[in-house]
C-alpha cells in the first residue's frame, strides 16, 4: 500500500463526517480540559493512542489530563472521579471493563461532563454520548478471511485443523472481533474443511482475560499437549498481537517453525512492533492495522462537535450498550502481512523502518 493510504483515509473520514456545530462554538482561548483515561501502558498501542490524542488536543488549544490505570479497575474509577472533580468538561475513556463505569459516569452527567467511549464500548450506562472506534466486526472478517485465503479453502483444499482464541470477555469489542471472524470461518467448519481440534468454540470457551499473552500461551500449551500429540495445527485465530506472540511462543516450544513443522497461520491485530518483526521472521502471518492517529483525530473532532452543540458520527445503529444505542464513528481497518507492511506502516509515517531493524 502506498504512502497515499493516510491521506486517502483522512479524506474519507472528513468526507463522511457529519459535523453540525452550534452557533456559539467554544473559543480557542476558552477551550477546557479533556480527561483521557487509558487502560494500561503494558501495550504500546495504548501509549501511542494517549500520545496521539494529547498532541492533537493540545494543537487545538485544549488542555489534557492523561492517565493510565495499568489494568486496575478501581484505579481507573478513581482517576475518572478525579478528572470530574478537577472540572474536565469531556472524558475520553478506553475502559478496562466497560461494565464497571455506571456510577462514575452518573457523577460526570450530574456535573455536565460529556463522555466519549474510545475504541472500547462502555456498557450499561445512558451517560455515554459518543463512541469512537474502528469497524470491529470487519476486523474479525479480515482475520478470518486471511486464514481462508492462506489455507486455500476457497480452492477446495483441506481439511485443516484450527484453534480459536478470543479477546477479553469484559471488552465488548472482543465479541465483534470473534463474530466477524466466525462469519467467515463457520461455513468451513460446518463443511468439515476446518476442524477445531479441541472442540472449543464460542467466547465462553476461547476468551482471554485482559488480552493477556501469558494466559494465551498457557492455553495453547494445554491445547497442544491434549489434542495435537499426533497431528498438526494448521491455523490459529488470534484477535490481538499480544495474544499472538504468546501463541507463537507455545508453538515454537514444541517444534513449530522448523522446515519439517511449518508454523501455522496465526493472525493478530494492532500491528505492534514485535508482531511486525514476527511477520518478517516468517512466524506470525498477519495482523490488522488500525491507524490510531486517525482515531485520535476523529475523537478530537467529536469533542469539538460536542462542545459546539453538534454531532460527529457515521453509525447510529450498531452499538447498543444495553441502555442506549451509542452514536459512533467507525474507521476502516487494514490487513497487513509481509507483502504490504512497509507501504502501510512505514511509508505512511506510522513507524520508521529503523524500528524493525
Curated annotation (Swiss-Prot):
For this chain's UniProt record, which GO biological process terms are given? chemotaxis
User: Which GO molecular function terms does the record list?
Assistant: carbohydrate binding
Q: According to its UniProt record, what is one Pfam family this protein matches?
A: Peripla_BP_4
Localization annotation: Periplasm
Q: Which residues form the signal peptide?
A: 1-20
**What is its induction?**
Induced by D-galactose, L-arabinose and D-fucose. Not induced by stress conditions such as nitrogen limitation, osmotic stress, salt stress or temperature stress.
Family per record: Belongs to the bacterial solute-binding protein 2 family.
Further comment: SbpA from A.brasilense cannot complement an Agrobacterium chvE mutant with regard to vir gene expression.
What is the name listed in the Swiss-Prot or TrEMBL entry for this protein?
Answer: Multiple sugar-binding periplasmic protein SbpA
